[in-house]
Amino acid sequence: MSDDVLLSISDLSVEYDVDPPVQAVQHVSLELHKGEVLGLAGESGCGKTTLAYAVQRLLKPPAVITSGTTVLHERDGDVLINDLNVDQMRAFRWDKASMVFQGAMNALNPVSNIGKQLADVFTTHRPDMSKSEIRKECGELLDIVGVGADRIRSFPHELSGGMRQRVMIAMALALKPTLMIMDEPTTALDVLVQREILTQITELRHKFGFSVIFITHDLPLLLEISDRIAIMRHGRIIETNTARNIYFHPQQDYTKRLLSSFPSLTGDRSEFSYGTAGLDNDSPDGEGGERE
């Protein structure tokens, strides 16, 4: 394994223990390099979010990890995430690996100002910090993400959707993790705000050197921000390549269909595709069950 690998996912499978069982993630193996943005693309229900939750061990019943290992390669040694106990896992999240959740801008506590919510991250994970140090850190974080330290006493309802999303990114950045998982971080934002958020993520990644797993069904968006892209379908990774090669030289028919499903501003209109790509008859297991 290369020295620049930060995260290794090996043969990871997740099953929803219902009747009949649903194989949400099937034998996924991926590597994330240090300082890299790895895009994870696929239609809704293909298993992207389930995979992200499995990495962070945030799955709730009836979801069960049935096989595989996830390892974070740190300077001071490897962390086998599967083997961490509850307290170790609680300390691991946000400190080593943080996550910006889908619909995160609506996850802020409406009756608490954003400064207090940011401070909670430090009081939980950095109990030795003084109140003045925490307040200074919170103000600096708000400046870094473009909200401004002067909004530290603002409540979520006083901020736009884009600003609330920036606050969530500030929380994810707070403890300077080496890994950040972003699950549809620009959902429900207009295209101009989306562009600003993407530009900011790129700048922050270069500034702080963290690695990103960026999850979305929007393949054109991933082509702009990602170094490499993994295409997911029916719970499996079917293709992984550089963003450039995914665009110019896709290997799988499904990848080609994903690319062609987005309209172009120029050129001829492509043929209409009948049916739903994720529910057709050519799935690996003959079924196209819904996955999160």
Sequence positions of predicted segments:
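Conserved ABC ATPase signature
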Residues: 155-159, 163
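A short, proline-enriched helix->beta-strand linker immediately N-terminal to the Walker B motif
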Residues: 174-178
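Short catalytic/signature loops enriched in Gly
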Residues: 3-5, 145, 152, 242-292
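Conserved ABC ATPase "signature" region
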Residues: 73, 120, 132-150, 259-260
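Short, glycine/charged-rich "phosphate-handling" switch motifs in NTP-dependent
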Residues: 228, 240
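A short, surface-exposed alpha-helical micro-motif characterized by mixed small hydrophobic
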Residues: 222-224
